Amino acid sequence: MADGGRVAQARALLQQCLHARLQVRPADGDAAAQWVEIRRGLVIYVCFFKGADTDLLPKMVNTLLNVKLSETETGKHVSILDLPGDVLIIPQATLGGRVKGRSMQYHSNSGKEEGSELYSQFVSLCEKAVANNTKSVEAGVAVAHGTYGNRQVLKLDTNGPYTHLIEF
């Protein structure tokens, strides 16, 4: 359940990192695998549920990019925009799973087309928010993202037990 007893429309898992690398396309014949990567920053895993709509996206982006979870060298907690740090966005439908017996079920997740559209717009809004942030622009902050609906390989170096689950 999200705040106030209402049913969640989305779930995001935030993971601080020193470096992350995500394979967005596997090797195929002569073509090498394609990867996106970020330096120190934030990995955002995101899942949308049935009933989610585009009205939710600005609130999600504002919350996720402005929550003070990143730690400076002096130990002060700041947002990823204030750090500034890179952002890697990964679609993660398994965040919507529920245990039934000894199996996982994903009946609450949005449909593939709806989820793909919400994910695409979420990525765009994150890119715009970073591009409109002076500190991020000056630091050359990167926003990278995975491909909705594909299995992806992730390599991640973390800098502490900084993993947070947020429902919207």
Curated annotation (Swiss-Prot):
Could you list this entry's UniProt keywords, alphabetically sorted: Cytoplasm, Hydrolase, RNA-binding, tRNA-binding
Identify one Gene Ontology CC term for this UniProt entry: cytoplasm
> Where in or outside the cell is it found?
Cytoplasm
An annotated GO BP: aminoacyl-tRNA metabolism involved in translational fidelity
Q: What class of enzyme is it?
A: hydrolase
Superkingdom of origin: Eukaryota
Supply the EC number(s).
3.1.1.96
Q: Where is this motif: Gly-transPro motif, allows the protein to recognize chirality of D-amino acids?
A: 160-161
**GO molecular function terms noted in the UniProt entry:** Ala-tRNA(Thr) deacylase activity; D-tyrosyl-tRNA(Tyr) deacylase activity; tRNA binding
Q: Which Pfam families match?
A: Tyr_Deacylase
Signal sequence: where?
A: none
Instruction: Determine if Cytoplasm is one of this entry's keywords.
Output: yes
Please give the catalytic activity noted in the UniProt record: a D-aminoacyl-tRNA + H2O = a tRNA + a D-alpha-amino acid + H(+); glycyl-tRNA(Ala) + H2O = tRNA(Ala) + glycine + H(+); D-tyrosyl-tRNA(Tyr) + H2O = D-tyrosine + tRNA(Tyr); L-alanyl-tRNA(Thr) + H2O = tRNA(Thr) + L-alanine + H(+)
Tell me, what does this protein do in biology? Deacylates mischarged D-aminoacyl-tRNAs. Also deacylates mischarged glycyl-tRNA(Ala), protecting cells against glycine mischarging by AlaRS. Probably acts by rejecting L-amino acids from its binding site rather than specific recognition of D-amino acids. Catalyzes the hydrolysis of D-tyrosyl-tRNA(Tyr), has no activity on correctly charged L-tyrosyl-tRNA(Tyr). By recycling D-aminoacyl-tRNA to D-amino acids and free tRNA molecules, this enzyme counteracts the toxicity associated with the formation of D-aminoacyl-tRNA entities in vivo and helps enforce protein L-homochirality.
Q: How does it assemble?
A: Homodimer.
Give the protein family.
Answer: Belongs to the DTD family.
Q: What is known of its domains?
A: A Gly-transPro motif from one monomer fits into the active site of the other monomer to allow specific chiral rejection of most L-amino acids except L-Ala. The trans conformation of the motif is maintained by Arg-151.
Report what the protein is called.
Answer: D-aminoacyl-tRNA deacylase 2
- Gene name of the encoded protein: Dtd2
